Amino acid sequence: MAFSGHHARKRFAQHWLIDAAVLTQILDAADVQPDDRLLEVGPGRGALTERLLASSASAVHAVELDRDLVSGLRQRFADQARFSLQEGDVLSVPLTLADGRAANKVVANIPYNITGPLLERLLGRLDRPVDHPYQRLVLLLQKEVAQRIRALPGQSCFSALSVRLQLLAHCTTVCPVPPRSFKPPPKVHSEVILIEPLAPEQRLEPLLAKRVESLLRQAFLARRKMLRNTLAKVLPAAELNALADDLGISLQQRPQELSPATWVELARGLNRADLVDPEP
């Protein structure tokens, strides 16, 4: 057997997805087309990989850190010409296919302990997005993180991450995933989400994105405080009041109560007035 004697390792945050219904919903959300080149992160024993290879995709490229799993995956899919495998850390290795082409979709049950940095690698930052965005990413995440990504203003889990991701992409829920869908079962609930990055022409212009990022860092450091206090260092009170009145923003609101669009308007107001330079 390809994986004989191999057990899930905590240091790699390994939990094998064994729920056929969830695997089907992941593939449905990926909407795989014949010319698609798929990137899978952390394929584990290959349950999702097998489904991806059974689709019409032209190529499936996986990145796996666990050397023992790499050996098993190569044995299991040795006869699959459309499959390529990169051993290494997904945060540092090249994500191109074996022939040098880039993947256009990401479909993955990602290790929860690298969610933040991996999202940044796949999507970029608000002020430095990736040059060539993926068409879509179907990711199995810890439910708490997924909720923060798609949270609405005013919800307790709405955060700077919510604003950043929603200004970079359209984010929707695919399905909930309970612990019993994995072996071994994790201690947390999970969720599959669909992330559809905005096209380059739909992104914020660089200076505006930089200003938004600066405001988010300043405001969400003290998310329980009113904007009057969190933005006090951004500009003098009189000018802050005038800008808030012009934009219809109440300075008694807290950071998590403003929508992504409102943060953009606030940043645009600062740029228009040229009141303060964004942080480098």
From Swiss-Prot:
Its main location: cytoplasm. Its EC number is 2.1.1.182. The keyword Glycoprotein does not apply. CDD domains: AdoMet_MTases. It is an enzyme of class 2 (transferase). It is found in: Cytoplasm. One of its GO terms (cellular component) is cytosol. Pfam families: RrnaAD. The keyword NAD does not apply. One of its GO terms (molecular function) is 16S rRNA (adenine(1518)-N(6)/adenine(1519)-N(6))-dimethyltransferase activity. It catalyses: adenosine(1518)/adenosine(1519) in 16S rRNA + 4 S-adenosyl-L-methionine = N(6)-dimethyladenosine(1518)/N(6)-dimethyladenosine(1519) in 16S rRNA + 4 S-adenosyl-L-homocysteine + 4 H(+). S-adenosyl-L-methionine binds at residues 15, 17, 42, 64, 89, 109. Keywords: Cytoplasm, Methyltransferase, RNA-binding, rRNA processing, S-adenosyl-L-methionine, Transferase. HAMAP family: 16SrRNA_methyltr_A. Specifically dimethylates two adjacent adenosines (A1518 and A1519) in the loop of a conserved hairpin near the 3'-end of 16S rRNA in the 30S particle. May play a critical role in biogenesis of 30S subunits. Belongs to the class I-like SAM-binding methyltransferase superfamily. rRNA adenine N(6)-methyltransferase family. RsmA subfamily. This is Ribosomal RNA small subunit methyltransferase A. It comes from Prochlorococcus marinus (strain MIT 9303).
